[in-house]
Amino acid sequence: MHKTPVLTLISVVIAFATTSPAFGAVISEPIPLWPKGAPNEKGDVGEEHDTTKPGDGLVSGQRVIRLGNVSKPEITLYRPSKEKDTGTAAVVCPGGGYSILAMDLEGTEICEWFNSIGVTGVLLKYRVPTRPGDDKHVLPLQDAQRALSLVRFHAKDWNLDPKRIGVLGFSAGAHLTASLSTTFDRRAYEPVDDADRVSCRPDFSMPIYPAYLALKDQDNKIAPDLNVTTNTPPTFLIQAEDDGVRVENSLVYYLALKNAKVPVEMHLYPNGGHGYGLRPSDKLISSWPKRAEEWLRGLGMLQTRNP
């Protein structure tokens, strides 16, 4: 194993950053995940682009960026202001059915919310759509494992606490969050450099309106790719009972975590549907970011560090 050029240059990339008007945040340049290209990637999905069409539905009166044909995965760091910075970071996994990525609704907007509570948001642009003949989840899991390890590997360089690095995701991204939280001891790819010697176990896990966790045709058994153990990280779950993706996804995961004695908090709301992110509405479910903040505070993730 050795330190590759991409690892050496990442700290330089962070130095070339822009300031966001929200909360005085600093946004890094995008950082490629893989020094020599992503594993198992053929690059034959077409040009990356926003697939949203004029007639596509709005969320809270706003359009959604639906990014498709991602073959070059990367992370972008959203840093909170120095006054708020807790040293905690969260990898953010947008949803989109493993077909597209809802990059603003379930990505940039979430990173900005994390900044407001002193957390660095690490926006993960993982590979979509599923390639013909490939398992739906393998390439995204490779990217998520690599992202978590890369952030932890650079924790000192980026002034982060290596013991406060978690993951949050929505819908398919919530499945990716749960997968990362239950397979961190088994790399989905051959290690490529020193970053892969670092654990990819999240310190906290936040699947929001998850998909693919329950097997509908098998009496809602938990999906076999999710190996919940006592080492699965503390987990926070949100879902609406009228979610068309089925609330059983949260229920079976909650029970598996509870039976494994993993700290878990779940909030179910009578209505809210699916795919709302944290955009405001008149529904009670719009209060979930406050519940999430309280949960993170209870874990000690929002304590400011001593100067």
Regions from the PLM with identified roles:
Residues 94-99, 241:
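Active-site glycine-rich loops that stabilize anionic/oxyanionic intermediates
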Residues 25-85:
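N-terminal cap/lid segment of alpha/beta-hydrolase-fold proteins
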Residues 251-307:
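C-terminal catalytic histidine-bearing segment of alpha/beta-hydrolase fold enzymes
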Residues 86-95:
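Short beta-strand element of the alpha/beta-hydrolase
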Residues 142-230:
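Primarily recognizes the serine-hydrolase "nucleophile elbow" in alpha/beta-hydrolase
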Residues 101-103, 109-110, 124-161, 279-285:
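Catalytic nucleophile-loop/oxyanion-hole region of alpha/beta-hydrolase
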Residues 244-250:
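Conserved alpha/beta-hydrolase "acid-adjacent" motif
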Residues 237-239:
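Short beta-strand/loop motif that positions the catalytic acidic residue
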